[in-house]
Amino acid sequence: MKKILVSFVAIMAVASSAMAAETMNMHDQVNNAQAPAHQMQSSAEKSAVQGDSMTMMDMSSHDQAAMSHDMMQNGNSAAHQDMAEMHKKMMKSKPAASNETAKSFSEMNEHEKSAVVHEKANNGQSSVIHQQQAEKHRSQITQN
């Protein structure tokens, strides 16, 4: 019994020290798309109930996110209001489908490249700051 206990403690010590020494990218841990609430909503079945009003299951992901930010316990906070507004803007500014081919990154000017980098950052879609910076760079494209 003593050998089992000693070997168990030794294994736990090695395993815990290995986990503690492991480096991790915090952006991978806080990415909103990986949150359980987002995972459950994306895999949930569509509502079969027909009615006049839209249900949560029938809304687009931006509709759901905007409503979630508005309805949270601290939904009146500036951060949640900014995020809800950002989702509402994204719903309005969805580009129409086209057959155009996008410019390659090497053909873009510095502002176009900066806008793309801000939008494609690990937390670019969920960060208000990255979206604002991307919009700022895009406005400078038309000015130049």
Curated annotation (Swiss-Prot):
Keyword field contains Metal-binding: yes
Region (Disordered): 86-144
MF terms in GO: metal ion binding
Sequence ranges of Basic and acidic residues compositional bias: 108-121
Signal peptide: 1-20
Expression induction: By copper.
Major subcellular location class: periplasm
Domain of life of the organism encoding this protein: Bacteria
Coiled coil: none
Subcellular location(s) of the protein: Periplasm
Key words, A-Z: Copper, Metal-binding, Periplasm, Plasmid, Signal
Family: To S.typhimurium SilE.
Protein's name in the database: Probable copper-binding protein PcoE
Lineage: Bacteria, Pseudomonadati, Pseudomonadota, Gammaproteobacteria, Enterobacterales
